[in-house]
Amino acid sequence: MKANLRSRLFSPITIAGVFFFIASSILTSEPYLLMLTAAQLIFVPLMLQLLLETKRKHIIFNWIAMLSIFLLQVVPSSTGQMVLAFIYMIFTFFVACYGLKRFFQRGFTNWAEISIDIGMMYLFVGGLWFFAYIAGIDTGFSPLITWLTAIHFHYSAFLLPISLGFFGRLHDSTWYRLIVPIILAGPMLVAIGISFSPLLEFISVLLYIFAIYTLIVLAYRTRFLSHLQTILIRLSFSALGITILFSLLYATNNSFGLWFVSIDFMLKFHGLFNCLIFGMLGVLGWVLVPPKTKQDVWNFPVSQIRGVLKGAGKQHPGLVDELSDFVEINTLPRTIVHFYENTDQYRLFASVKWATWFKPFAVCYKLISTKLQQLNLPISSKRTEMTYKIRAVDQTLDGRKNPRAWIRQVKENTVFVAIYSQHKKEGRTYMNIALPLPYSSMIGILQLDAIDGSLILSSEGESDTGIYLAAGKALFKLPLSEHFLINETIAGILTAHHKMRIFGIPFLHIDYTINQK
């Protein structure tokens, strides 16, 4: 711990940042401006050292950005200051791109890492507002409000999400997953409220208060990596619990004219408290012992087929060779097992039901899917027969074990082209399904379970389960989930209920009836 603290606090970047900050504090004529300078020269570089690889280009970017911030104190010409502020803005853009790259390498999974990604992206917004302040751009607000927005996106929108992400590497719970999106949306909602709607600002602050106090409670229930880190992080989060109350008073005054709180008071108390206690103690706490990510590296086989399926060969009887590879079949009706192993002996009838709120999107997508002949579901809920064929796929083209394509049609239109395979991890076999798309492929990794005589296939299970988009070498987890429930209702007749959600919200339900030919 001491070695790590020494390597971070006494790194050339940190020492230079502290030196530049001290020099800036001597040169500045407005001491309150130092709250943003502290973030730009000390807090942001320290946090980035915990996130970015120590590559030469990253170090050079940091040095250039810090030097530009310091030179703002000594360069007298407005043109020179604009150039220096622009350089810093480019640096924040670089950080945002790195956060975006992290996100696209992983997708909608792991709220802790998403929080870090969003924090890095938000820094660019802070850089834009800082440039607007230095350049004197008319944003529609006073120069002070423009500067306050810049500091808002350095502390509330960068330091807090990064700190929240590090905390999530140590603590994961339903409450944590609830407050993360609230805190991540908070900076934007508060900024929009300040700009356009005092009432929205008031509501946003109320939500923010709920999330912050929940975070404080969670912090006091969490075991940290060292005793000193425990003290520092709890104090840092607790400081937010105090300063956010003054934000509420300020928002209440703007909305209803009650409990007058001036900008001057917010600068002296709210800003200084956030800078010294939340910012400084929080950064020191994470620098002590940076928690390691718990994000798994996905290494399951991915279909290499993109666009229109080519290389479909001879007819294949079933979606799987042996259902027993996936699940214990002794408790399942024989018809379910037979259907999966001899799919070509069955007829399939479907009724597609789109959620009312999603129908406009479904209609728009139908214009695209008709041309793609993929994921081309009917808009009507009328019961219709899906005809199909199962064809073997060249394993050398696909890259997975023993792939076969299930090609389903409604009349002359292809509805699905799904290439089935499987892979095994940690003693469990998963269904590995690919749906080729232009220059990409949608991948569904499903876990199979036999429960009370029913077969359940779900993308919300263990290990690799999920729905992904594969493009090039990137594998992006989508905010989608699917769940199949298959029963034998009458001897020889199966029903299957297929439900899909986006961001946890139901948007599609397909009812299938399956009977032998």
Predicted feature locations:
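Hydrophobic alpha-helical transmembrane segments of multi-pass integral membrane proteins
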Residues: 1-310, 494, 498
